[in-house]
Regions:
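Bacterial N-terminal signal peptides that target proteins for export
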Residues: 1-8
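Bacterial N-terminal signal peptides
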Residues: 8-17
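Hydrophobic alpha-helical elements and their junctions with loops/disorder across both membrane
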Residues: 17-19, 128
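Boundary at the C-terminal end of the N-terminal hydrophobic targeting segment
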Residues: 19-21, 25
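Histidine-/acidic-rich catalytic cores in large beta-rich domains
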Residues: 26-331
Length: 331
């Protein structure tokens, strides 16, 4: 055989395995399959906001943005948002917590004192707001937004009093009139009564979000997974996207919510401070898992419209009044 032809034949053989390896590698870097389950923006009506360099919030109905809020002059990032039944929006954006009317008028604002941060806030009726103030010490506060007076205040433990940013991101009130707090730097979730007494706690790896369920259990977002646990600490179910849905690259879980049909909505945050978004291969912003861990809806909207990173969502398919909660005798 001609030596040159032999060399060409050998090169062809050696390149064949390389080509077969490169193609799957390209597929493995995809953030999600090309065809996504569900109806996109039209799947649900919902409130959407996220930790981003832009403080924006959106209300989506029937697949369209019907209301949006932009706070270009503000500081921080929106970590929490709650849409009240009267249309007002409560947001916590690190350096302040504020209540905004449907006409985008700021009805009430409270700035975080120097050296502190506010990442989570909850309405109690129409007159009170509970918020958690990261700091040294870290505090749970309930303020009357009509009078400006503090109704309740107590300190809560933290792992690192000086590491203000890493203390808390999320808390929620339960039907028992208690407060659930995800202690990120203590690797646990705690339940407090209105006096500040710890009622119970659950060990967690890196808890970001916590959601009380109607059955009395709670959802803990442990960053790599979402666990439903009982009050006694028994794990009822676990969703681990990296193994349960490996085709979807979900690397930064923050919050999860149980939908009325039993499915679980999970957000997937993109860190704008950690890198530039690849708009040719953007990550999903949220997914819905069935109880048997099938994905039935995926939200990925980075253009037309660009919703930005996802942190918090509130499904609006049915009328609700999230302000109808209590903290002890505060209603």
């Amino acid at each position: 055989m001609n030596p040159n032809r032999t060399l060409l034949f050998a090169l062809a053989l050696s390149s064949a395995p390389l080509a077969s390896v490169q193609s799957p590698a390209t597929e493995s870097t995809a953030a999600a399959p090309q065809v996504l389950p569900g109806k996109g923006l039209a799947q649900h009506d919902f409130l959407y906001a996220g930790e981003s360099k832009n403080r924006r919030a959106f209300i989506i109905r029937k697949g369209q943005i019907v209301w949006s809020y932009d706070d270009p002059a503000g500081r921080g990032e929106i970590s929490d948002a709650v849409l009240l039944s009267n249309g007002n929006l409560l947001i916590a954006h690190q350096y302040a917590v504020k209540l905004i009317s449907p006409e985008k008028k700021v009805l009430w604002n409270l700035d975080a004192p120097k050296g502190t941060e506010i990442h989570t806030a909850m309405p109690i009726g129409t007159e009170h707001v509970l918020y958690v103030q990261n700091g040294d010490p870290a505090l749970v506060k309930v303020v009357n937004i009509k009078t400006g007076k503090t109704k309740k205040e107590f300190p809560v433990p933290v792992g690192n009093p000086k590491g203000v940013h890493g203390q808390f991101r999320h808390g929620r009130l339960t039907s028992r009139g208690t407060l659930l707090l995800a202690h990120m730097d203590m690797k646990k979730v705690c339940e407090f009564d209105v006096t500040g007494k710890e009622v119970r706690s659950w060990a967690a790896g890196n808890p970001w979000g916590v959601t009380p369920l109607k059955n009395g259990n709670i959802l803990i977002v442990d960053r790599p997974s979402i666990r439903e646990v009982t009050l006694a600490g028994e794990t009822v179910s676990t969703i681990t996207p990296s193994t349960d849905s490996p085709d979807f690259k979900m690397t930064s879980l923050q919050m999860a919510w149980r939908l009325p049909n039993g499915n679980t909505l999970v957000n997937n945050w993109f860190n704008e401070w950690g890198g530039k978004l690849d708009r040719t291969n953007p990550p999903v912003q949220a997914v819905v898992f069935t109880p048997d861990k099938n994905i039935v809806w995926v939200l990925r909207s980075w253009e037309n419209p660009d919703l930005g990173p996802a942190t918090t969502m509130q499904i609006l398919d049915e009328p609700g009044a999230p302000e109808q909660v209590s903290f002890g005798d505060i209603k």
